Swiss-Prot record:
Name of the protein in its database record: Ras-related C3 botulinum toxin substrate 1
Organism: Cavia porcellus
PTM characteristics: The N-terminus is blocked.
Coiled coil: none
Cross-link Glycyl lysine isopeptide (Lys-Gly) (interchain with G-Cter in ubiquitin), where in sequence: K53
GO MF term set: G protein activity; GTP binding
GO biological process: actin filament organization; cell motility; neuron migration; positive regulation of bicellular tight junction assembly; positive regulation of protein phosphorylation; regulation of cell migration; small GTPase-mediated signal transduction
Lineage: Eukaryota, Metazoa, Chordata, Craniata, Vertebrata
This protein's domain notes: The effector region mediates interaction with DEF6.
SUPFAM superfamilies assigned: P-loop containing nucleoside triphosphate hydrolases
Superkingdom of the organism of origin: Eukaryota
Record-linked SMART domains: RHO
Disulfide bond sites: none
């Protein structure tokens, strides 16, 4: 949501697709431990959907940062 105000200001009619990346790390033990040290947890799919709704995004997608295939497939539809 960091860029949301700027995007809405400069491109008010542009549809937004919110993308949750690094899906492959959601279940990664090292990543989970590092997040726990900061009192954080990975973002869940329902949390991503809620954020998309909050900012008025037309779609919420998740992908592995390694492939980004899901996002590309959706973008060309």
């Amino acid at each position: 949501a960091k860029w949301y105000p700027e995007v809405r200001h400069h491109c008010p009619n542009t549809p937004i697709i919110l993308v949750g990346t690094k899906l492959d790390l959601r279940d990664d033990k090292d990543t989970i431990e590092k997040l726990k040290e900061k009192k954080l947890t990975p973002i869940t799919y329902p949390q991503g959907l809620a954020m998309a709704k909050e900012i008025g995004a037309v779609k919420y997608l998740e992908c592995s940062a390694l492939t980004q295939r899901t996002v590309f497939d959706e973008a060309i539809r």
